[in-house]
């Protein structure tokens, strides 16, 4: 079952759990209402019972979050 997480701190706590082994980072290029392009980054973490997703529209926050992921977590970039 999939769940969407909106809080970054809660997402980082999920990545430190023992049952979480892999994370997927997907970067999409989208347009805002004014037609200006921006990067949307999706972080997907697979737990034992659920797939947790965090969506971030700020590229700076996304880079910091990628760096703060635990080193034991296997990260796939799409």
From Swiss-Prot:
Q: Which InterPro entries match?
A: Ribosomal_eL38, Ribosomal_eL38_sf
Q: Which UniProt keyword terms apply here?
A: Cytoplasm, Ribonucleoprotein, Ribosomal protein
Any one GO molecular function term: structural constituent of ribosome
UniProt main location, coarse: cytoplasm
Localisation: Cytoplasm
Its GO biological process annotations read:
cytoplasmic translation; protein-RNA complex assembly
Organism domain of life: Eukaryota
This protein's GO cellular component annotations are: cytoplasm; cytosol; cytosolic large ribosomal subunit
Q: Which family does it belong to?
A: Belongs to the eukaryotic ribosomal protein eL38 family.
Summarize the protein's role.
Component of the ribosome, a large ribonucleoprotein complex responsible for the synthesis of proteins in the cell. The small ribosomal subunit (SSU) binds messenger RNAs (mRNAs) and translates the encoded message by selecting cognate aminoacyl-transfer RNA (tRNA) molecules. The large subunit (LSU) contains the ribosomal catalytic site termed the peptidyl transferase center (PTC), which catalyzes the formation of peptide bonds, thereby polymerizing the amino acids delivered by tRNAs into a polypeptide chain.
Query: What is known about its subunit structure?
Result: Component of the large ribosomal subunit (LSU). Mature yeast ribosomes consist of a small (40S) and a large (60S) subunit. The 40S small subunit contains 1 molecule of ribosomal RNA (18S rRNA) and 33 different proteins (encoded by 57 genes). The large 60S subunit contains 3 rRNA molecules (25S, 5.8S and 5S rRNA) and 46 different proteins (encoded by 81 genes).
Anything further noted? Present with 50200 molecules/cell in log phase SD medium.
Tell me what this protein is called. Answer: Large ribosomal subunit protein eL38
Per the UniProt entry, what species is this protein from, by scientific name? Saccharomyces cerevisiae (strain ATCC 204508 / S288c) (Baker's yeast)
- Report which gene this protein is encoded by: RPL38
